[in-house]
Curated annotation (Swiss-Prot):
The chain crosses the membrane at residues 3-23, 44-64, 76-96, 144-164, 184-204, 222-242, 331-351, 352-372. It comes from the Bacteria. Pfam families: SDF. GO terms for cellular component: plasma membrane. Its main location: membrane. It comes from Yersinia pseudotuberculosis serotype O:1b (strain IP 31758). Disulfide bonds: none annotated. Keywords: Cell inner membrane, Cell membrane, Membrane, Symport, Transmembrane, Transmembrane helix, Transport. This is C4-dicarboxylate transport protein. Belongs to the dicarboxylate/amino acid:cation symporter (DAACS) (TC 2.A.23) family. InterPro entries: C4_dicarb_transport, Na-dicarboxylate_symporter, Na-dicarboxylate_symporter_CS, Na:dicarbo_symporter_sf. It is a multi-pass membrane protein.
Amino acid sequence: MKVSIFKTLYFQVLTAITIGVLLGHFYPEIGAQMKPLGDGFVKLIKMIIAPVIFCTVVTGIAGMESMKAVGRTGAIALLYFEIVSTLALLIGLVVVNVAQPGVGMNIDPATLDAKAVALYAEQASQQGIIPFLLDIIPGSVVGAFASGNILQVLLFAVLFGFALHRLGEKGQLIFNVIESFSRVIFGVINMIMRLAPLGAFGAMAFTIGKYGVGSLVQLGQLILCFYLTCILFVVLVLGTIAKFNGFNIFKFIRYIKEELLIVLGTSSSESVLPRMLDKMENAGCKKSVVGLVIPTGYSFNLDGTSIYLTMAAVFIAQATNTHMDIMHQVTLLVVLLLSSKGAAGVTGSGFIVLAATISAVGHLPLAGLALILGIDRFMSEARALTNLVGNGVATIVVAKWCKQLDNDQLQAVLSNKVLPNVKNSVSVS
């Protein structure tokens, strides 16, 4: 039975975003007051992320025949993340040097309002590779779940999964309980996702209502340059990776179109993390691979954020006439290879990492962040969308390299064909 287009999440979210843009543009004061709708939806999603990751990772690892396979999957995923993230950083660096969107602005850093970025600078001072690594270890298991720290929950879930696997038959009862709990959790997700159009409407109405479409004009060159770079990265880089691994990037984008629209409305790739876990498993990737790659990718494989970081940093240098030679840019790249791993898939984290990077490099004026602050919210959509597509592609590629991919199921799903063993648990229509 064919579902009416009006009942699909895709249509509902697209309609909600359109209404949000119109409300924010024509009635900005009312639009700005819609922020709680977007915030509330994202909070509902965050509420469920920790248990989803725990259940997915534990059942995935405990259900595997060999523990060596888990270690191999993790190693391959991290290698992939590092290579592709580095490519994203390099592409952002090359494009911003060629396009030079900041040249000619001739802004004196002394005239910029440093107070506007003081909070971000303070948060950035706490960034660093050692604190980041130590922060992965939770002070307590309860604290990890309470704060919703993805990497902390992931670490505990991996250890729990290993321990449960070692118990063998003795741990079967616990395994069954967690698997049943997982089904309940995904039922809760389906209920929450019915509110996605409302969340997308609120977030978009607030963005347009508060900042206005006109605020994009002055710094439009950077925004346009960034969006085009993200599109080129997805089509050329991720498209090439997809082609060499046996699937079409455009078919994959069509497959996750509902998730992309939700991310477009909320500006946070984290808002669809639970659905992506389910959809990637539905696409033929084994649960153990999905449970490791997707959550880890939210900190280690943020392609859109990587592009943004190099472009924004060099843009500030160009706009303030701060000279950056080859060595300065190489230093920037090296620092970003480390600092970019501290970003999470949530709105605003990329800006904090940018502040941390500029502080660490020392050559760029920190006050220059004020130039980016006003348009950062408009760039977050492209960041989040690119991050989402990048993590989806990474999951399929790692699953294939680890021989944990059902290619027939993948091709059937991407071609809109239904196999008897394909579950359709992601439908919320």
